[in-house]
Amino acid sequence: SDAIIVIKVIPLLAKIKMISIPRDTYTDVPCEKGGKVDKINHSYAFGGRECTIKAVEELLGTKINYSVVFRFDDVITLTDIMGGVDIVANHSFTQDHETFKEGEKYNIKGARALAYTRHRKTDSAFKRDERQRQVMQSIAKKLVSPSGWGYVPGVYSYMQEKMEISF
């Protein structure tokens, strides 16, 4: 896995909280032969979504009730369906011929959204994790706002047909 993000939805407070688990975090990977300690991002290769969920549950000591697997193509397609999402760049960089300047606001979609979420060469994995959470939050924020409700059927349809989801 490129990124593992745990999301907690608190409906009564209308809040969504996210944490990223660094991909190089060593933990028990229960699906690996012999159940050994390995990088958590290897759990997907050993047993897919279910193995990753088990590894995250063991690491955090909490139950994961629902999951979504986002692939690179999903970031491209979902942000395209939604007409882009708004972000404020957390770092200045160029990735895949896409340039971002720290502190500037952008509406990103498609390959530009993917470039923003994948960059880590000139800053850090932590900044990249922050960008990934930022794009996820922007997708959620747009879908729950009245102006974004029109995108919900297209996003839902795409997720049902093309993505690994459990909810």
Set out the residue ranges of the language-model regions.
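Non-catalytic, solvent-exposed segments at the cell envelope interface
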Residues: S1-F167
